[in-house]
Each structure stands twice: as structure tokens, then as C-alpha cells.
């Protein structure tokens, strides 16, 4: 397993101290790949989760810890303003059936179906694809704004952050 966190990515090193590996992880009765706890700087990960997405899920959950530590930098209202006026996120990630993790080839502002659930999940999906190096080949203007927002936020935390 590789987090790909080589170098001086201070925002990650300072935000994450422990990774707990477990099986059959769930929250509110719903199976989940991981649960971030920014207070304890801990990431709980289900090692039985779909291997196809496992490393990307690690990056996704790491972003939640970063996001929770730097809410003022990763503002959800600013993020939501990038979307078309007709789009609204769900109230919570477990309040929607949008759970698909396959990367879209036609993005239309979103990188996966799950990224349409909430603003924080959308940010985490963009970050995970950046870290994992599997962005779609064609990126639309909305998704490009989101990518630039994540990169800019990370550089505000750590000027040496390298994606």
C-alpha cells in the first residue's frame, strides 16, 4: 500500500498520525471504505474494501482529515459555487444513493458519481484522483476550477506540496 506521500507534504504529515486497519467497517449501518477522525488524527480503513479503489480511497479519506483541519481554506460555499446553478448536493453523504466510484470519462463538473453527494465528498474525490494520478483525459471547465481550488488550498497550507 502506498500513500504516495513522499516529500514535505506538511499538511498531511501534521494532520495524520495513525492509520487503523479493520474489516467490515460501517457507519450508520452502511458499509464504508474509511472513516477519518481529524481530532485524533486517525484514519480507520476497511482492508476488505474493493481492491480496485483501495489506494484512491486512502487519499480520499486523508483529504477529509486535511479538510476538517482547514475548513477556512476549503470552503464548501466557494466550492459549490463552481457547479451549475441547477445542481444541489445532498444534505449528507449517507442521504443519497450516489455512491459510484468509477471515474467518469465525461466529467461535466464531477469526477465520479460519489462526488455528486456532498461538497466535501466532491473535494475528497478530486484530491484522491490528483494524488492517485488518474484524472480523466478530458477535463471540463467546472472540474478544472475544482482542481485549481484544491491545488491552491494545499499550497496555502504547504508551499512545497507537490501534486
What are the roles of these predicted feature ranges?
Residues 1-12:
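Short, small-residue-biased leader/transition segments that mark boundaries at the very start
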Residues 17-163:
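Active-site-flanking segments in enzyme catalytic domains
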Amino acid at each position: 500500500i502506498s500513500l504516495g506521500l513522499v516529500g514535505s507534504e506538511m499538511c498531511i504529515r501534521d494532520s495524520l498520525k495513525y492509520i487503523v486497519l479493520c474489516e467490515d467497517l460501517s457507519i450508520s449501518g452502511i458499509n464504508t471504505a474509511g472513516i477519518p477522525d481529524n481530532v485524533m488524527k486517525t484514519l480507520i480503513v476497511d482492508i476488505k474494501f474493493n481492491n480496485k479503489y483501495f489506494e484512491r480511497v486512502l487519499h480520499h479519506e486523508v483529504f477529509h482529515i486535511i479538510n476538517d483541519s482547514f475548513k477556512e481554506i476549503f470552503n464548501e460555499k466557494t466550492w459549490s459555487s463552481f457547479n451549475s446553478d441547477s445542481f444541489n448536493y445532498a444534505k449528507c453523504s449517507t442521504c443519497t444513493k450516489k455512491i459510484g466510484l468509477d471515474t467518469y470519462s465525461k466529467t461535466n463538473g464531477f469526477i465520479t458519481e460519489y462526488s455528486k453527494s456532498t461538497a466535501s465528498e466532491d473535494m475528497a474525490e478530486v484530491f484522491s484522483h490528483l494524488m492517485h494520478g488518474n484524472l480523466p483525459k478530458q477535463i471540463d471547465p467546472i472540474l478544472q476550477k475544482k482542481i485549481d481550488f484544491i491545488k491552491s488550498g494545499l499550497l496555502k497550507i504547504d508551499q512545497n506540496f507537490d501534486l
